[in-house]
Amino acid sequence: PKSVYAILKQLKPDKYPKVDDDATILVEYPSATVQIMGSWNWPKGRKDMHIYGSEGYIYQDTPGSMRVYTHRKEKTTLPPKLKEPYNDSFYYLKAAVRKEIQVQPYDLSSLENNLIGVEILESAIKSAKSGKPVRF
């Protein structure tokens, strides 16, 4: 990323007295901006993703399907079924530890990829404290 900007809040201090319970994080890349919103304060748990582009969008409201809009049409698609060990995080970890699979640097569960995630989150905390974007 080029920069990270974040606002962290504590909306329910009586319920979560020691932590921020609401976060909005903007991650700026050369040709895109990602908005991450996370909260323990919402009345309903959410695990959705919305991606907007210049020619359409993708909504993934549930893990089991996504809506793709392009060329003025929306189509619902189902994700492909993953084979073992990729269909279960514990089987995946076991296979990686036993070297039954080769984890690639940009796989979702790779160390390299997750270190980028940690760097983004640490930058979000610094940004929230300073009130300014953290540049990379």
Residues covered by each model-derived region:
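A short, sequence-level motif marking secondary-structure junctions
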Residues: 39-43, 63-67, 80-86
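Broad, structure-driven detector of short, well-ordered beta-strand segments within folded domains
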Residues: 56-61
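C-terminal helix-rich "cap/oligomerization" subdomain common to oxidoreductases
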Residues: 95-136
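Glycine-centered tight beta-turn/hairpin loop motif at sheet-sheet or coil-to-beta transitions
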Residues: 29-33, 55, 72-73
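Active-site loop of classical SDR/Rossmann-like NAD(P)-dependent oxidoreductases
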Residues: 80-92, 109, 116
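Rossmann-like dinucleotide-binding domain that binds NAD(P)(H)
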Residues: 1-33, 40-44, 112
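Short beta-strand segments
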Residues: 34-36, 47, 76, 134
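Short polybasic amphipathic segments
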Residues: 49, 64-73
